[in-house]
Amino acid sequence: MEAPSENGFYFYVLWCADQTLYTGYTVNLKQRVARHNSGQGAKYTRVPKRRPVQLLYYESFENQHDAMSAEYFFKKQSRKEKLKYLKNNGVIVTTFSH
């Protein structure tokens, strides 16, 4: 995965320390991941057992609507479907499947 630019429209997936997935949308990916890891991110990632988080996957978009639509679609999938989506997009998920 190539490094994201500092600003843009991103849909992203985090791997949490408790082996769960967190999905979000942001305009500054590096800053958002740092906020999740500092405990200042979403309520879900503020739970200490979920940190640290790792950026597992992201997609960049030309506009906010498309990034938010991708996030919405992904969040509605089952865990099994999410892992399949990630695998189909080049993420090695064998270590993340349990």
UniProtKB/Swiss-Prot annotation:
SUPFAM superfamilies given in the database record: GIY-YIG endonuclease
UniProt cross-references to Gene3D superfamilies, sorted A to Z: GIY-YIG endonuclease (3.40.1440.10)
Domain of life, per lineage: Bacteria
Any Pfam family matching the protein: GIY-YIG
Residue span, GIY-YIG domain: 7-84
Stored InterPro entries: GIY-YIG_endonuc, GIY-YIG_endonuc_sf, UPF0213_domain
Family note: Belongs to the UPF0213 family.
The protein's name: UPF0213 protein in ldhD 5'region
Origin organism lineage: Bacteria, Bacillati, Bacillota, Bacilli, Lactobacillales
